[in-house]
Amino acid sequence: MGQWKVMILICLYGAVKEFRPTEPYMYEYQHTVLNISEHTLNSEVYPIWTYSYLVALIPSFLLTDVLLYKPILIIEALSYFACWMIFVFGRSVWCMQLLELFYGWATATEIAYFAYIYVKVPKEDYKSATAYTRAALLVGRFLAYTLAQLLIGLNWADYMTLNIINLVSMTFAVFLAAILPHVPWRNAYQKKLEDKKSVTDLESLVSEAKYSDYLKLFFVELHQNLYTIYKNPLVLKWSIWSALSSCIFYQIINYTQTLWGTLPEKENKYNGIPEALVPLLGIPADLITRQMNVNWNRWGDALISVGSLLQAGLLFWMSQSHEIIILYICYIIYRVIYQLTTTIAQSTLALTLDSRLFGLLFGINTFVALALQSILTAIVIDAEKLAIRAQFVVYSGYHIVVATLFGIIFGIWAIRTIWRKRSH
């Protein structure tokens, strides 16, 4: 199959697997239709996603290359399929806990989606491949959430109808994952060797190689890349921010619907609007940020500090507000700020780090973020059993701590810069 046919197929898979119209109304369905209490959902159901994602991430990361991508993509599709089979036919708390387990597996295996295309296209097409595969995800989400809003907002369908549409979509995703071309290990081995400038007579090496040679090269590169990444202080700093920021971001998207659910049910008919607007606003925000001619190595700490303070204010406002429109607006702005700062971090790292190391860096940072989120969940939800509005006050305080940390780093840099100028 030609590389552009593969590109179209993987992008179609990406859009279909993200076509999940149930998501803006998951809490409403579980709370109002299944009659599961807010406390049970917060303390016994939703935390399982965090723990499942954490446990599944490292095996997924390692096995993606070892099993040559496609099997992991199939596991991702099957995990999403299992989620919505449970949504359609499950009714108990135990079923919802099992759903969160599969949801964690599906999220963890998403890494194969981005890794697969890099083995299938030439290196010079990596940039366009990344753009297309990411755009496919955004398109799938936007269409799903827009459809959900129309169906629920206009009373054309109920939550179970959304579940059935979702199940059909995930069934199609399984089919697409199954028909994706497999990746011969020799192709993957050749891709890795192409990045080594010292390698000569590439065709001979590949033709004489064994699968064990491919595995050996993978683990040797893994060790070397870990050292390369974390010996750079700039990469380490942005990695710390990425882990801290992603930790609280995952927590917010996991529990925002619970906060919306504290308002009368009729006001939650519009949950699809903010979820649809986030990817729609995220694309131009991402493009504008990438075009900005700013030295983020110098001003990045200040931006992170200001952005975290703004996010702290938004979360605190959400914790106090009983107006759904305020909650929606704060949520959208919060997500866009996260998108902007993440784009800046990626752009900065792109100037510092070999693009081949991004996947490894993302995997490690995500693992650290999930470990931190697990600790946060254990303290705020499992131990203290805080109500949802009190939780958002804590999350606001978390952002203030992050803002203070990076504000201090920026302050130290500014003082040193001024001192050096005066010394000269």
Swiss-Prot record:
Q: Which GO terms describe its molecular function?
A: folic acid binding; vitamin transmembrane transporter activity
Tell me how this protein sits in the membrane: Multi-pass membrane protein
> Any transmembrane segments, and where?
55-75, 78-98, 101-119, 136-156, 164-184, 313-333, 361-381, 392-412
Q: Which residues are glycosylated?
A: N35, N254
Q: Where in the cell is it found?
A: Membrane
> What Pfam families is this protein classified in?
Folate_carrier
Question: InterPro entries per the record?
Answer: Folate_carrier, MFS_trans_sf
- Which GO terms are recorded in the biological process aspect for this UniProt protein? transmembrane transport
Main location group: membrane
Q: What does the UniProt keyword field contain?
A: Folate-binding, Glycoprotein, Membrane, Transmembrane, Transmembrane helix, Transport
Is this entry keyworded Transcription regulation?
A: no
Gene Ontology CC: one annotated term: plasma membrane
| Similarity section | Belongs to the reduced folate carrier (RFC) transporter (TC 2.A.48) family.
Question: What protein name does the entry list?
Answer: Folate-like transporter 3
Encoding gene (name): folt-3
